[in-house]
Structure formats: structure tokens, C-alpha cells
Amino acid sequence: MLLPADQPGVVAPFDDVTIELCKSNPDVMIMTADLQPYVDIFQVPKERPKQFLDVGMAEQNLLSIGAGISKAGFIPIATTFACYASRRAFDQMVICMGTGPRTCVVIGFTPGITSPARIHHQSTEDLAMTRAVPHATVIDPVDATEFTQAVRASVTQPGLVYMRGLRGTVARLLDPDRYVFEIGKTYCLRDGGGPGIIATGAGTEWAVEASRLLERAGIDHALLHVPTLKPARHEEIWRFCEGRSRVFTIENHNIVGGLGGLVAEIMADRGGGPRLTRLGVPDHWAPGGSLGYIRKSLGLDAESLARQIKEAA
């Protein structure tokens, strides 16, 4: 399922999948809030202008209008930065989109610490917020293969779907000929004994980097990818944890309420489990700067992650 290291990236996969969806389904409406080139929307406005709507720099309007057109039979895919989709327009996401059965897709780009602009544009709490919305679907894709398939799946999912978006040249980790995304499903990327690593989104990319370092060091371990944080298959995650002495979660998110919170809840519900270490953004504001700098300052670079896991082996 995992491709060899150093695969060429995929340029603007969101642009390709949205034009594909619009051509196959005239009810799909691609929406944005004055961020068209920054969320990789290029082909739809030119080729399917009646299926594109830019509401201007007004994220609350973006989601409330999206909810409104869903009642007229459209399938909105509303795009903006994750910080705006979650923090600025959360009330509209919950009340307008989240309380009905109609499909409403919200895609938040530059999630977590992937923005260099510090807290103004970083979104390290969006997964925790959206996980708490009743009946919502929450997806954090790892690469171009998964992101493309998840967008396709989202337009057939009833109710609110919140997904983190990937833009620009997006990494390719998963083999598109072998990988099949399914909402809720988990994916074992490395089987083994010893410490277990559970990751999601960009955290899975970082976990794969650390896993390769651990392999070179002869450290046995296992790696589970959890792209859907809600609805998650708790039993699959529990089976992965069961029988291990240590489990680590790795995520591009605050350690409160995201993947680490999900795994902790599963263990608590079952009354035990291995010792859990949550690796992500600690309970303080992340710095600004390049992604490499931010990761290293938070102990999320491959070497730091591998060292922490190796010490527990």
C-alpha cells in the first residue's frame, strides 16, 4: 500500500477531482470565500462556471449559503482555510450545515501547523471542534491519493463532512492502484510488535518518516493510519492497541481533542490498554516559520519522533 520513499508529488489534486465531480454530477457546487487560487480551484470556474460560487471574503456567508443551496438540491463543497472554516464560521457550520441530513462538505486548507503565519492562520483545534458536532464526518487525509478519493466519497455522505485540504504539490505516499479509501476504515501501514504508532493526516507522513528511521535502527514497531476521526472504527483501533505496552499518536493538531483524544477515549471506554503518549502540538501556541522549523521546535521532526519511540521500545 505504501509507495517507496521520494515519490514525485501531485500538483493541485483538488483541482482535478473537482472538475471531475462537476462533469459527472451537475448538482455539485464548488464554493470559496475569495481564495480561489489559494485552494487550487482553476478548472471549474472556466469550464463549469454555473457550478462555481465565490461569496467573497465572508466565511460565515460561505457556509450559510452552502447550507441554503443544499436545501435546493445542490451538493456544496465549501472551501477556505481551516482556521476560518472552524474558528470564524463554526456557528454556521454547526447550525446551518450540521443539523440536517443533506450533504454539506467543508474543506479546510492549510490545516494545523502547515501555515507559516502562526496562530492567525494555523488551525490546531479544528479536528477537536468538528469531532464534537453530532453526526458529523471528520476526515484528515495524508496524501494526494487519499485526498482525491476522500473528496469523491464526501459527496455521497449524508450530513456535514469536514475535511482537511491539501494544496499545491501534494505528497504521494499511498499507491493509487492498491489503496481504496473508505469512510471510517483504518489502514495498517506496517505490521509488527513493539510500540504501536497511530497517526492521521500530515502526522501519518511524519510517522512514515520516523518509521523508516526505526527500521534502519532495527526497532520493531507497527503503524496504523486513521484518516477518519469520525465515525471511527473503535474496535479496529482497540485491536491495534491491545497487547502492546506503549502506543504513540502523531498528529498535525493540538494533543487535546484530536486523534490522541480519540485513542484515549477508546482506551478509557474499555477500561485499560497500553500507556499512551500523544505527540502533536502541546497545549500552547505553535511558533511561526517554515514547516521544518515548526516541526523541529515541537519535536515532530522525523529524528525526534523516532528517538522518543525508540526509547520506549
Regions found by a protein language model. Name each.
Residues 1-164, 169-170, 180, ...:
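Thiamine diphosphate
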